[in-house]
């Protein structure tokens, strides 16, 4: 009986330690502060990338960022796979209504861009965004809430 209680308690501890640490993310997705992230080595336009992300997970969109640490986390996922390259992120004025927005509807509370044009990519080497032609093709960074 004592062994059963010990094993049951051990399993409970393992379960509780895994909850919220990625156990809730889909396979191949990485958890960070209540969201799951995945970088895809597939080139597509910004509009196709946003559609692709919405098809990958419930609540999925191109990644939005709210701190430099969050961008650094995405870079840590992207650089080993893509080396020096770019990934689409959710920031755009794709609809040309003169209002910069995240595709997931999140508040624009952190900015790290330069250049011009209507969509954004993030470099895979540092915390910098570039305004980019939406019709060009790039790899994809997706995010969904837990």
From Swiss-Prot:
One GO location term (cellular component): extracellular region
Alphabetized InterPro entries for the sequence: C-type_lectin-like, C-type_lectin-like/link_sf, C-type_lectin/snaclec_domain, C-type_lectin_CS, CTDL_fold
Signal peptide: 1-23
Domain C-type lectin, residue spans: 32-143
A Pfam family matched in the record: Lectin_C
Keywords: Disulfide bond, Hemostasis impairing toxin, Secreted, Signal, Toxin
GO-annotated molecular function: toxin activity
Origin: domain of life: Eukaryota
Disulfide pattern: 25-36, 53-142, 119-134
UniProt subcellular location: Secreted
Tissue: Expressed by the venom gland.
Alphabetized PANTHER family for the sequence: MANNOSE, PHOSPHOLIPASE, LECTIN RECEPTOR RELATED
Purpose of the protein: Interferes with one step of hemostasis (modulation of platelet aggregation, or coagulation cascade, for example).
Quaternary assembly: Heterodimer; disulfide-linked.
Family of the protein in this entry: Belongs to the snaclec family.
Protein name: Snaclec CTL-Eoc124
Organism from which the protein derives: Echis ocellatus (Ocellated saw-scaled viper)
């Amino acid at each position: 009986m004592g062994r059963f209680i010990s094993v049951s308690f051990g399993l409970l501890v393992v379960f509780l330690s895994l909850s919220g640490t990625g156990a809730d993310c889909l396979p191949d997705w990485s958890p960070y502060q209540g969201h799951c992230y995945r970088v895809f080595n597939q080139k597509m336009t910004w509009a196709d990338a946003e559609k692709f992300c919405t098809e990958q997970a419930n609540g999925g969109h191109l990644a939005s960022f709210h701190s430099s640490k969050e961008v650094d986390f995405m870079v840590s996922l992207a650089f080993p796979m893509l080396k020096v390259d770019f990934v689409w992120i959710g920031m755009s004025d794709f609809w040309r209504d003169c209002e910069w927005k995240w595709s997931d509807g999140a508040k624009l509370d952190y900015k790290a861009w330069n250049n011009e044009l209507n969509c954004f990519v993030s470099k895979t080497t540092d915390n910098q965004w570039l305004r980019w032609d939406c019709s060009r093709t790039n790899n994809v960074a997706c995010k969904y809430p837990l």
